[in-house]
UniProtKB/Swiss-Prot annotation:
Gene disruption phenotype: No visible phenotype under normal growth conditions. The double mutants rrp6l1 and rrp6l2 have a late flowering phenotype.
Region (Disordered): 583-605, 649-668, 688-775, 821-870
Residue stretches making up the 3'-5' exonuclease domain: 263-428
Domain HRDC: 479-559
Function field: Acts as an important epigenetic regulator through multiple silencing mechanisms. Involved in association with RRP6L1 in the silencing of the solo LTR locus. Controls levels of non-coding RNAs (ncRNAs) from the solo LTR locus. Seems to function independently of the RNA-mediated gene silencing (RdDM) pathway. Functions redundantly with RRP6L1 in the regulation of FLC locus. Participates in the maintenance of trimethylated 'Lys-27' (H3K27me3) at FLC locus via the regulation of antisense long non-coding RNAs (lncRNAs) and the regulation of diverse antisense RNAs derived from the FLC locus.
Official protein name in the record: Protein RRP6-like 2
Residue ranges, compositional bias (Basic and acidic residues): 720-729, 821-834
Segments of skewed composition (Polar residues): 840-849
GO molecular function: 3'-5'-RNA exonuclease activity; nucleic acid binding; nucleotide binding
Location in or out of the cell: Nucleus; Nucleus, Nucleolus; Cytoplasm
Domain of life: Eukaryota
GO cellular component: cytoplasm; nucleolus; nucleus
UniProt entry tagged with the keyword Lyase: no
Amino acid sequence: MSDGNMDVDESPVSWKVKSLEKLIDGSSFSSTLSRLSSSSRLIPTSRDFHFYYNFDEFKRPIDEITGTSQSTLATIGDSEQVWGKSMKFPGDVDDVYAEDWLCNVNDELIERFDVSVDEFQRIRKKEKEIGRSVVADDGDDGFQMVYGKKKKPVGNVVTGSAAVNGGGSVIDVKMAERDKNSSGKAKVPFHVPTIKKPQEEYNILVNNANLPFEHVWLERSEDDLRAMHPLEKFSVLDFVDKDVNEMEPVKPLPLEQTPFKFVQEVKDLKELVAKLRSVEEFAVDLEHNQYRSFQGLTCLMQISTRTEDYIVDTFKLRIHIGPYLREIFKDPKKKKVMHGADRDIIWLQRDFGIYVCNLFDTGQASRVLNLERNSLEFLLQHFCGVTANKEYQNADWRIRPLPEEMTRYAREDTHYLLYIYDLIKLELQRMAKDDAHTDSPLLEVYKRSYDVCTQLYEKELLTENSYLHVYGLQAAGFNAAQLAIVAGLCEWRDFIARAEDESTGYVLPNKVLLEIAKEMPDSVGKLRRMLKSKHPYIERNVDSVVSVIRQSMQHYAAFESAALSLKDVSPGNVMDKNIEPISEKKDLHTGDVASPSLKENSSQLESTRDLIMGAANTNEGRGLGSGLFGSAKVSAAVRISKKPSSGLGALLGNAASKKKSRTDEKVKEDVKLEQIRSSVNLSFHSFTEKVPDSKSTSETSPKVYGKPEEMSSTMPASVSKEDGVKELKDDSEEASEIVGTSGRVSESKVSSSEMGDIILLENGDEKKVDAEDEPMSLSELSTNFQKCFKSMNKSKKAQKQTEFLNIEPFDYEAARKEVKFGEGHKGRQGKREAAAGQKKGSTQEQSEFGQGKRRQAFPASGNRSMSFKN
């Protein structure tokens, strides 16, 4: 009776608490997990499972377990009140999507548990600080997402600091507590996902078609080929300020004392237009969001006059801003002061059809003044002594209504800008007097501002090569199949982004895109498992993404050439390419020596090539042509490779590199031979009796050069030390002989280790070789060849005699007489010790002084060291 009353009186919450305590009890919980783990090992897997499944004794319990599990999972999936969304179970545990569904459910549960634990710890910490129980946390400054919670409105008041949008719905955002470890700065979110998209909230229509943007508010040129900006009717001189020295800077009122109005209605916009018509200058700035829109979305427009500040809600008044403000911004008599207006100008054109005339860009002015920094934050501190809070610069400006901190930040962007404009003009005027510039610095600022205004907005278009511009692709080193996946996913995300009016970075970030292409997941399960974070559009279209991957992999052949091109221009391969030691158009008497591979490089490699060429084109490199070929008519058309080759260095006879390690050890031998064979073409102009170039025939062809005056360090030679070089003088009778250890030159190949001997001619011989005054007859030519062959035969015979001069058969009889049998260990050991040069005596001496120490092969531990002595 009492137990029953206790059960009845016990609340559901307390019962759940007791159940959880019982579950996580140390002994029972761990033992349950242990038994479960042990029993799972008994279940057969893979082939064994299918074998046992043929027997009813195994099949029946398995079917029961399957049915129970499937029913339980279906119940979990149908609980929309728990998940807040539909998570229906696929219907069959054997379905390929069942595993993915289970992974998603587990991820959702774990995430909710983590959020709940963090919230619980935060509340407990606050309770300890204040000493009393806390039900919910009041809002502080900043913003923070709170999982699954919304502030409930009480009447027309929103509790805490949650925001109510124009439609009366509560935005799921609350002010976050300040971070004590970051000097009290609030945590400002870059993206608040719970904000309803302004495109849907305010019915903003955008044209994301893959077509060029049309500037419908501009006049066309006479040939109708381009749009004409209103500024083209004016000159820069029309906007330059006159009598700057007589101007007195107007200091602004404090921010708190300046009248301020948040413009959200058309009547307020009309009042703003009337105010702007009565002033000569005003400051403008825009706040923008690029993350949740394909082309971008202007969120706010800040305008300040000398006496008032305005913030225009560009969401609610989007269709009215252009008609009311277009003529004001176009008026050349009204000065518009902006800071860093490069992007603001095109945003005004895109969203409102507004084209600015008569602009003064303080960002360009700071560059002309050569200030320490060019940011607005620096200008505020430098000219006004105001420390701007720039942490809201990248905040999510779609939030409505604006919190007080963000409103203040938006006002500061334009409130002080006209005063900065006054001070900068004076600085520019002083700069002109001090430096005596040919062009006025003030005029230079207006020229730059003029150029900023005349740029026109262009929509991002998808082309067949758009995927090549993905950040990080060139360094990824993808093959053709991976590159095909990149192209397919780029096209898919572009289509989704245009249709949903989302940025491509939100639909599929570049980093995730490259990771998918690298892994090439061909199933839904593989794709889900590799994603480290949630991406809404991938989860909604996971089947489409996998289909794109599969289809792209089937058409990889079309991307072979693109993959090779990307590998050629990758940073690693660029530095591995051969270095051109001579400038591209270096005349070596035989024509220009230019590397075709350099001319074929794309524009993306220009800076890298210039860096390499700058390091290679030294004075020594330039002297190479003049030193070797400057005074000789015997010319060689050599295409110098960009990276020095040892074979080519040996060909040029640079003996300095004999002391250096070979630079081409990593290059295959056949590649080196092919490079030398294709790049060297020697032409001999004449043959003389005193210099019979006998080996210039088809069998042997030694290379003839003038004696080098300067040897370039950029052309390393790798001639073997055994190769001989013989200088031929004027009266030498042995001019036809070529001395070398090898005695011959390879008939078809020239390499670093098998180079023929190089004949170095002195200056007198060069003149004889170069003399071509008298033509040579065929008989003389035949005589020269015969003499060459005779000298070659003499050389070969002499070499053969020297090679086999001392060869005699081994005398075994004499060897037997030298052998004395019966001498034991002492004699042999003494001979070995004497031959080795060891300072050891006989066995008696060794026993007297003890055994010498030996280097141990193992650490001295235990009996390991003793084994060396025994």
